[in-house]
């Protein structure tokens, strides 16, 4: 999913990646929250695909670091997830059950999607008496 958000000017470069670990308390009080951190999900990773130009210096400064904020287009990165199903078809859409994270580490619980699109099957592994697939998946929520 493509999203326009704000990032500090020193970090705004095409191809740059960042992960939102947690939204700081200061962000909730900021008047830019709705177009900045409010558009991102904790635990998810993003890649900057475009830096939008500003004709004038931005009057908006980040409450955390004091940097000038600039608009960027970001795309959510795919997740590596375990899927415990009898078979997997790349391109298919399936629900995701967080109980599948027992045998393979998953992103933080708040970052886990309820539905995913399978992009690529990476591996098939055994867990206890069963098997699961390790996949690259695009979150759909």
Swiss-Prot record:
HAMAP family: UPF0179. This is UPF0179 protein Cmaq_1008. Belongs to the UPF0179 family. It comes from Caldivirga maquilingensis (strain ATCC 700844 / DSM 13496 / JCM 10307 / IC-167). InterPro entries: UPF0179 (IPR005369). It comes from the Archaea.
